[in-house]
């Protein structure tokens, strides 16, 4: 190759020529490959990181070993073959390059090494590239590749790096290179007007075209700049070098230097392809990727032809050097920038400035190139220069023509696009016009259709109105025809009679439609009913009964409730006059027994719910797990006031019940309200929830406080009526229809209108139903009690349920709220099924006597909760219990909803269970003095129950009945009775239908014989006669009226008569009468059957019936016995609430004769009156014969004891006759107005005193009598007058009876009458004496010497009031050591402080201010002290964990009366007796309280063996001593009724007989066995010396488990009363329900006795107690733990009261 004079210039030319040759060959190769249609397989390009690593290894080792290749293969992710090929090609490349350009290679190598070292670490992350080169080693292996990369990098354009690059070459090369570079840089900086940036793009960089619309560029203009017509722009280019590359290099080098025009490209073989290869790969890649990131994939039109084929495959080898780029500076640069690429740099100057500067710059570059080329062309001749000039001109001409052609094509393209855009706009306008026209036509059609529909609807409505009018007329005609055979509403019948009389018509059948529609105009003409001829009397002549009808209603309500549920409450039946007399007596045994049994029922309900876990909302509200039935508000209130419900249960007896009643009333909210300083009600969950009991009730177990549970249950409907057959379930169609129709009044709505209003009201979504009208019709038709059909498809609610439309919004909002509450929490599928069943039954049987007897108001839902009685006050708003329930509910709601006004009180009524630092309900709890509650609570605080007035006593009993009626005990009984009554109704109705069908068959035969003598006209005779004939019938004898309805009478009175007998009776009856009776007897018989079924199973209090004015008639009689004075009384409750009385035979006959048999209500009333007519008249005649004082004068005297004066005539509140009306004398009340009444009063009062003495003195204090070691008593008690005296006396200081001759078996009436002290005070003295004598000596303080003891006895003997006795009791408390008392008991010394509790010189001590100064409060405190004294010091037992299932805690969370351990001190019933002598023989025996209902005491769980503490007075034999008392773990609240299996084993039968003897009265058998029993217990006592007592076991167990709560309500005698059921037979052979299937003596009847005996032979002795005597055992048997008052009249308290089974209910 011929070289110029300048050697350095020759080297540069060779380098540039070599690059050009490679580029052209690659393009030719690419074109040829694309023409052949064969696509070369893609080769994997190596990443820069791989190449750098390979280069480093190659520089160290050109022939790497196999280990080196393996390491490289793993590191670079290349195969061994790829590595071998790369090193082979690398060695070949070095060999080839070394031969051709050794000087240049050496100069560039330094630059290459420096550039390689600067390779970024992230090069390996560059995506793999596409390449079509044959050798992978060609990429990056050229000695110029790295030098080009250095120029192509972002920093290579800076002068600093260029200078550094220039210093690497030789001096001759560096001077020429730096000159060229400086020239290019100066030219560019002059164009830009500012220095080049070091971090800017490389010189000659071709930028991507702008995206469409960038910087405001029109989209259409952007497209046509890309020259889409040049097909070669998209041809794939093959960059692979040819084999002839090296051979042709010298020619191209010479051509590129000598002929600059050879670099001018055409449109199909562009310079930009070679120039684009000079761009750094990373820069080009980042440009394209950044565009793709922002705008999606790069369109091919925005990529240059070089990029289109090599954007991912350009190799560094193909990049031209800056020196070569400087030689390509003719006009092609301008053309390329403006027309080919069509790109603009947004960072440069505007278009005009940029293009002119580019032309200027490129012109300088061309001049420089020509100047440099002239040096080489100086040696050529003029011809050569001329040829070159000609060639240049040709090239310029060709370029100009090409540019003109491109411009023409561009204009054509713009014109075409403009035409297309205009056409598109015209097309869119045409479519828009067509759409507007289409919409106008559609709206026009819709308007026409709506107009046609409106016209059709108007025509249809007119037709419907005509059709409805015709249907109404037809329905009226049918109703009139039906009324001729069916009964009519009583008031409507009377209005029809008045209308017929006014129009002169003989019968109501002749009334026209208009008259029947306007019967209301005759309402003012209605006469009073009952008629004035019926002389009604005032029922009572004394106060307070004659002063208030509400008081009379409350009295009758309470009596009816107690009689109806006497079996559930375990009360003996009593008459109404006995009940009234009890209120007027000074102290009544009957009222005491009633209060005790009601309190026990309430406590039992609380215990049941506390024992039964509450699983949540899905529980049935009628099960015993219903938390509301467990009185959560009472539990909440008891905690707030500091009362202990367990103490109520253990110490409830005839002496303490008034104080427990007071505490219960305060807890229930009847007394003054508790609140905090900031006018907030107390809350049990305030801040100390974790410190208190975990199980107040099941709702607290569930994690909620009792108050919130009460509120949520009330919101969710748990306080709703109990299973009413006409109940409205929220969310149903019936519920929605009722609320909508109740606002419409009597006019009603059609089904269509009703459906529309229901949908609009939001009470029910009817769009989900395909046939909503049918659903509404079915729902309304099935319930005729609430809804009435007044026309075809038109319904309304009955008159009592109509509401004011003005309140419509509030009513509907309340209904929607109920629906939401129902959906959120409460679901009861069982209820729904029961409701459906009852509705099915309702189709066949009308269980209610009359329509309006259900609940005459919307408030019926509240009354149904009470369950037992209907309204006893004639007001429509009053239901069931005559407003008493409403009063109770209002008090409860007031307690928990509206806090009372803020008032402070320094001393709040706390009880000893509270710690001295705590206050009621919390630190800030105070009493609101502005609202003291009901007066009887204040009376019980200030005095005893005997000091209450009659009205206060009644109010207290009403409140107690209201609470008990909400409990689960009553609810369960009601549920059982309701189901039994429904089943009986079905059975009776089926039998009646069967008998009726048989009777009709017989009558058909008889009618054939009678047809000849009867005319056919009489067959269809209407039953409704004219008013004249009907009035004539009233004047006849009632017996004649009965003859007209003999078929009905016979059918209803005796359903079990044979059909033949009834056929004979009806044989001579008139055919019209037969037809009349057969048509109307169905509804009457339904009413009669319903009434009879509810008499057998009463679940509500039903009157005999109602008359036309809705006056109610009641017969309050226990039985039809002549001894019952109420059997001859008929109470009338007028509609205005007034109570009157019918007590004569004449008045009864007038009432029966005035009733209209054609009316619904009066027809049923007449049947019921005829049913009781016989007994009523017989007893009334007997009463007339009795000589009575006609009238009594009123004496307003306060209650006092008959023994307070010589003449006890002023014993109670008396009354006088009424001035306005005659007063009945049928109910007599003894008020001490004569000697007979005084004698009766004294007799009853002495009977009460004997009962109190028997029930309390022999059993209290119970623990002291069972476990105490009695010392000598300080005082003795007179058996004649119950007076205390010093023990050294021989005569009683009160009755002056000689003590050694007094019969101790009976208290003398004369002795009781002479004592000046109240009986309660006299009774407390011997109890205190016995308690003091039973306290162990080691339990007393050191100061309690014999002298101090005598002083205490003297003070006790001189005490004459409950307050003085409380001081004496407090003195005894302070004398007992703290360690000898239960940790749960807080003495007055601890609560008030030791300084305040010390006695002064006179002996008075400070007592607890919150304990009332009453006999019952002192007795309750005495019982609590007795239960807390540790009479026997226990020994340490084996520590055995307790059964968690028995943990039933009613402690409040932060209650201070919980001890150090949960069972450190249990009830005193568990205390073991004194240990006796040691004995090697060991056995297990049951120990416990001496009552007939045993507490299930703590069970130490050791394997399957558990021990309990049984009763001490069980006369066991040797076989019993080895019995282990295993019993099952109780189920979670489920009642299990099991038959007691028959025992044929001789030992077992003997054991049962021995157990049964315990509850028998004292007899000779007991006395015979006394010696054997004492010997038995004596032997067992000896074993205690070697063992441990239960008391020590309890304390150690409590110390082991300090964090467990004490079980306050174990399943003891009284708890068994709540969950157990014993049959009425006292021989123990009936059903018995118990949580653990144990009998009342603690034995497991379901276990094998023989196996238990064998297993117990190896058990350790738990211990037994010392028996003090059979007398004490017998006394404690009936009254100790349970304190059930013994009722000798009915023997109900001599046996165990365990509740009643479903059969008994």
UniProtKB/Swiss-Prot annotation:
Annotated Polar residues bias: 253-265, 310-319
UniProt entry tagged with the keyword Cytoplasm: no
InterPro entries: Asxl_HARE-HTH, DDT_dom, HD, Homeodomain-like_sf, RLT1-3, WHIM1_dom, WHIM2_dom
GO cellular component: ISWI-type complex
Domain spans labelled DDT: 549-608
Main location: nucleus
Sample GO molecular function, one term: DNA-binding transcription factor activity
Chain spans, region Disordered: 1-53, 118-167, 237-267, 296-322, 352-414, 1028-1053, 1198-1229, 1441-1502, 1561-1635, 1652-1705
Biased composition (Low complexity): 136-159, 1201-1220
Location of the HTH HARE-type domain: 731-800
Record key words, sorted: DNA-binding, Flowering, Homeobox, Nucleus, Transcription, Transcription regulation
Organs and tissues of expression: Highly expressed in growing tissues such as inflorescence and flower meristems, young leaves and floral organs. Expressed in roots, rosette and cauline leaves, stems, flowers, inflorescences and siliques.
DNA-binding region: 39-98
Disruption phenotype: No visible phenotype under normal growth conditions, but the double mutant plants rlt-1 and rlt2-1 are small and display early flowering.
SMART domains from the UniProt entry: DDT, HOX
Bias-annotated ranges (Basic and acidic residues): 1455-1465
GO BP: flower development; negative regulation of DNA-templated transcription; regulation of timing of transition from vegetative to reproductive phase; regulation of transcription by RNA polymerase II; vegetative to reproductive phase transition of meristem
Bias (Acidic residues): 1565-1574, 1611-1628, 1669-1684
Function of the molecule: Transcriptional regulator required for the maintenance of the plant vegetative phase. In association with CHR11 or CHR17 may prevent the early activation of the vegetative-to-reproductive transition by regulating key genes that contribute to flower timing, such as FT, SEP1, SEP3, AGL8/FUL, SOC1 and FLC.
Quaternary state and interactors: Interacts with CHR11 and CHR17. Interacts (via the DDT domain) with CHR11 (via C-terminus).
PANTHER family listed in its UniProt record: HOMEOBOX-DDT DOMAIN PROTEIN RLT1, HOMEOBOX-DDT DOMAIN PROTEIN RLT2
Designated name of the protein: Homeobox-DDT domain protein RLT1
């Amino acid at each position: 190759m011929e070289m110029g004079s300048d050697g350095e210039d020759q080297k540069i030319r060779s380098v540039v020529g070599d690059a050009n040759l490679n580029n052209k060959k690659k393009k030719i190769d690419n074109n040829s490959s694309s023409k052949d249609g064969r696509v070369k397989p893609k080769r994997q390009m190596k990443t820069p990181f791989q190449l750098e690593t390979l280069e480093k290894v190659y520089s160290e080792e050109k022939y790497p070993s196999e280990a080196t290749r393996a390491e490289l293969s793993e590191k670079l992710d290349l195969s061994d073959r790829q590595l071998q090929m790369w090193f082979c090609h690398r060695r070949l490349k070095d060999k080839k390059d070394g031969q051709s350009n050794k000087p240049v290679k050496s100069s560039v190598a330094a630059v290459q090494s420096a550039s390689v070292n600067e390779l970024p670490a992230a090069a390996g992350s560059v995506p793999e590239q596409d390449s079509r080169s044959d050798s992978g080693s060609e990429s990056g292996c050229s000695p110029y590749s790295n030098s080009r990369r250095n120029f192509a990098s972002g920093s290579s354009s800076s002068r600093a790096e260029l200078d550094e690059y220039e210093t690497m070459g030789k001096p001759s090369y560096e001077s020429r290179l730096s000159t060229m570079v400086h020239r290019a840089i100066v030219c560019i900086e002059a164009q830009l007007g500012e220095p080049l940036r070091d971090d800017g793009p490389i010189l000659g960089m071709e930028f991507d075209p702008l995206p469409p619309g960038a910087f405001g560029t029109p989209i259409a203009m952007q497209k046509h700049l890309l020259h889409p017509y040049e097909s070669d722009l998209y041809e794939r280019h093959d960059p692979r070098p040819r084999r002839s590359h090296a051979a042709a290099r010298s020619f191209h080098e010479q051509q590129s230097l000598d002929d600059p025009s050879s670099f001018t490209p055409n449109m199909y073989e562009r310079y930009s392809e070679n120039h684009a290869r000079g761009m750094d790969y990373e820069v080009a890649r980042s440009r394209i990727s950044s565009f793709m990131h922002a705008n999606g994939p790069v369109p091919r039109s925005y990529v240059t032809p070089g990029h289109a084929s090599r954007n991912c495959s350009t190799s560094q080898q193909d990049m031209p050097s800056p020196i070569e780029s400087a030689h390509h500076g003719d006009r092609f640069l301008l053309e390329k920038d403006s027309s080919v690429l069509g790109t603009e740099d947004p960072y440069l100057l505007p278009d005009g400035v940029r293009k002119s500067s580019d032309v200027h710059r490129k012109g300088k570059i061309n001049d420089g190139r020509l100047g440099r080329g002239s040096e080489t062309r100086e040696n050529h001749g003029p011809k050569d220069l001329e040829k070159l000039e000609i060639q240049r001109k040709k090239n310029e001409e060709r370029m100009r023509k090409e540019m003109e052609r491109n411009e023409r094509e561009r204009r054509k393209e713009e014109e075409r696009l403009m035409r297309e855009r205009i056409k598109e706009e015209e097309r869119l306008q045409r479519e828009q016009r067509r759409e507007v026209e289409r919409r106008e036509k559609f709206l026009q059609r819709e308007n026409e259709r709506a107009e046609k529909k409106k016209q059709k609807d108007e025509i249809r409505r007119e037709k419907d109105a005509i059709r409805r009018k015709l249907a109404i007329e037809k329905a009226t005609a049918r109703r009139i025809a039906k009324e001729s055979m069916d009964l009519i509403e009583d008031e409507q019948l009377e209005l029809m009679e008045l209308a017929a009389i006014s129009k002169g018509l003989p019968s109501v059948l002749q009334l026209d439609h208009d008259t029947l529609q306007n019967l209301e105009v005759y309402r003012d003409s209605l006469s009073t009913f009952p008629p004035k001829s019926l002389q009604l009397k005032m029922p009572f002549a004394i106060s307070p009964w004659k002063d208030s009808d509400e008081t009379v209603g409350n009295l009758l309500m309470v009596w009816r409730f107690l009689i109806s549920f006497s079996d559930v409450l375990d009360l003996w039946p009593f008459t109404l006059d006995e009940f009234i007399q009890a209120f007027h007596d000074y102290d009544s045994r009957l009222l005491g027994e009633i209060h005790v049994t009601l309190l026990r029922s309430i406590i039992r309900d609380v215990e049941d719910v506390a024992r039964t876990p509450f699983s949540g909302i899905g529980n049935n509200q009628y099960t015993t797990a219903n938390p509301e039935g467990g009185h959560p508000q009472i539990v909440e209130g008891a905690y707030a006031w500091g009362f202990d419900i367990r103490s109520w249960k253990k110490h409830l007896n005839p002496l303490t019940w008034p104080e427990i009643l007071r505490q219960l009333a305060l807890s229930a909210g009847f007394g003054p309200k508790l609140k905090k300083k900031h006018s907030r009600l107390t809350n049990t969950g305030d801040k100390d929830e974790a410190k208190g009991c975990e199980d107040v009730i099941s709702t607290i177990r569930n994690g909620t406080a009792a108050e919130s549970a009460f509120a949520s249950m009330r919101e969710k409907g748990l306080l709703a009526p109990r299973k009413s057959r006409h109940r409205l379930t929220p969310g149903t169609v019936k519920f929605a229809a009722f609320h909508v129709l109740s606002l419409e009044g009597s006019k009603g709505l059609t089904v269509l209108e009703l459906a529309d209003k229901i949908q609009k009201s939001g009470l029910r979504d009817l769009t989900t139903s395909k046939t909503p009208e049918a659903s509404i019709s079915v729902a309304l038709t099935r319930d005729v009690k609430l809804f009435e059909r007044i026309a075809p498809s038109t319904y309304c609610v009955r008159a009592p349920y109509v509401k004011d439309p003005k309140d419509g919004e509030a009513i509907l909002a309340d209904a929607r709220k109920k629906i939401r509450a129902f959906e959120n929490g409460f679901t009861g599928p069982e209820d729904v099924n029961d409701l459906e069943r009852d509705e099915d039954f309702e189709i066949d049987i009308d269980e209610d006597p009359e329509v309006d007897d259900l609940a005459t108001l919307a408030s019926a839902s509240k009354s149904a909760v009470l369950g037992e009685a209907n309204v006893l006050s004639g007001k429509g708003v009053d239901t069931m219990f005559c407003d008493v329930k409403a009063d109770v509910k209002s008090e409860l709601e007031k307690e928990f909803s509206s806090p009372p006004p803020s008032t402070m009180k320094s001393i709040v009524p706390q009880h000893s269970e509270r710690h001295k630092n705590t206050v009621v309900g919390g630190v800030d709890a105070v009493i609101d003095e502005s609202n003291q509650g009901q007066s009887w609570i204040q009376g019980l605080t200030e005095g005893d129950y005997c000091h209450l007035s009659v009205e206060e006593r009644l109010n207290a009993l009403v409140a107690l009945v209201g609470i008990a009626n909400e409990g689960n005990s009553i609810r369960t009984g009601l549920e059982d009775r309701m189901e039994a009554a429904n089943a009986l109704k079905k059975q009776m109705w089926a039998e009646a239908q069967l008998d009726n069908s048989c009777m009709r068959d017989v009558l058909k035969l008889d009618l054939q014989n009678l047809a000849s003598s009867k005319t056919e006209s009489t067959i269809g005779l209407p039953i409704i006669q004219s008013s004249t004939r009907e009035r004539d019938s009233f004047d006849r004898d009632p017996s004649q009226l009965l003859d007209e309805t003999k078929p009905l009478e016979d059918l209803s009175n005796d359903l079990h008569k044979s059909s033949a007998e009834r056929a004979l009776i009806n044989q001579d009856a008139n055919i019209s009468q037969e037809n009349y009776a057969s048509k109307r007897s169905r509804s009457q018989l339904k009413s009669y059957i319903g009434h009879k079924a509810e008499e057998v199973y009463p679940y509500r209090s039903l009157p005999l019936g109602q008359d036309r004015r809705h006056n109610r008639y009641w017969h309050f009689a226990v039985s039809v016995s002549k001894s019952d004075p109420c059997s001859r009384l008929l109470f009338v409750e007028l509609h205005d609430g007034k109570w009157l009385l019918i007590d004569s035979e004449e008045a009864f006959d007038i009432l029966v004769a005035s009733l209209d048999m054609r009316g619904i209500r009066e027809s049923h009333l007449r049947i019921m009156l005829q049913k009781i007519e016989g007994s009523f008249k017989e007893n009334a005649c007997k009463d007339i014969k009795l000589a009575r004082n006609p009238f009594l004068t009123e004496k307003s005297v306060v209650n006092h004891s008959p023994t307070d004066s010589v003449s006890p005539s002023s014993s109670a509140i008396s009354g006088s006759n009424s001035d306005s009306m005659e007063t009945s004398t049928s109910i007599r009340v003894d008020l001490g107005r004569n000697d007979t009444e005084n004698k009766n009063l004294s007799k009853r009062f002495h009977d009460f005193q004997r009962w109190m003495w028997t029930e309390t003195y022999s059993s209290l204090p119970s623990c002291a009598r069972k476990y105490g070691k009695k010392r000598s008593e300080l005082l003795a008690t007179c058996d004649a007058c119950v007076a205390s005296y010093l023990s050294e006396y021989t005569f009683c200081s009160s009755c002056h009876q000689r003590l050694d001759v007094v019969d101790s078996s009976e208290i003398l009436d004369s002795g009781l009458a002479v004592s000046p002290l109240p009986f309660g005070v006299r009774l407390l003295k011997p109890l205190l004496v016995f308690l003091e004598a039973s306290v162990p000596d080691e339990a007393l303080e050191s100061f309690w010497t014999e002298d101090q003891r005598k002083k205490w006895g003297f003070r006790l003997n001189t005490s004459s009031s409950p307050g003085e006795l409380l001081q004496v009791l407090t003195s005894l408390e302070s004398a007992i050591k703290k360690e000898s008392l239960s940790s749960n008991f807080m003495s007055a010394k601890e609560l008030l402080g030791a300084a305040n509790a010390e006695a002064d010189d006179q002996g008075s001590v400070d007592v607890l201010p919150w304990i009332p100064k009453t006999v019952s409060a002192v007795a309750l405190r005495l019982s609590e002290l007795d239960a807390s004294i540790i009479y026997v010091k226990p020994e340490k037992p084996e520590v055995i964990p307790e059964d968690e299932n028995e943990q039933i805690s009613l402690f409040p969370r932060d209650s201070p009366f919980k001890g150090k351990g949960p069972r450190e001190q249990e009830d005193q019933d568990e205390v073991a007796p004194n240990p006796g002598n040691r004995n090697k023989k060991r056995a297990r025996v049951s120990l416990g309280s001496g009552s007939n209902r045993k507490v299930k005491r703590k069970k130490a769980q050791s394997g399957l063996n558990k021990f309990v503490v049984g009763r001490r007075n069980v006369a066991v034999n040797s076989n019993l001593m080895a019995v282990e008392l295993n019993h099952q773990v109780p189920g979670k609240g489920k009642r299990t009724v099991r038959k007691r299996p028959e025992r044929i084993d001789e030992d077992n039968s003997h054991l049962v007989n021995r157990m049964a003897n315990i509850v028998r009265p004292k007899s000779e058998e007991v006395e015979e066995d006394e010696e054997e029993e004492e010997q038995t217990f004596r032997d067992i006592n000896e074993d205690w010396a070697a063992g441990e007592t239960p008391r020590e076991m309890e304390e150690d167990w409590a110390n082991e488990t300090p964090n467990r709560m004490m079980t306050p309500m174990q399943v003891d005698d009284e708890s068994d009363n709540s969950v157990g059921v014993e049959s009425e037979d006292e021989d123990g052979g009936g059903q018995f329900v118990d949580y653990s299937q144990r009998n009342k003596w603690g034995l497991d009847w379901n276990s094998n006795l023989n196996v238990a005996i064998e297993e117990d032979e190896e058990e350790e002795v738990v211990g037994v107690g010392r028996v003090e005597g059979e007398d004490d055992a017998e006394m404690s048997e009936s009254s100790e733990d349970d304190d059930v008052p013994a009722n000798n009249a009915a023997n109900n308290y001599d046996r165990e009261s365990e509740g009643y089974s479903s059969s008994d209910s």
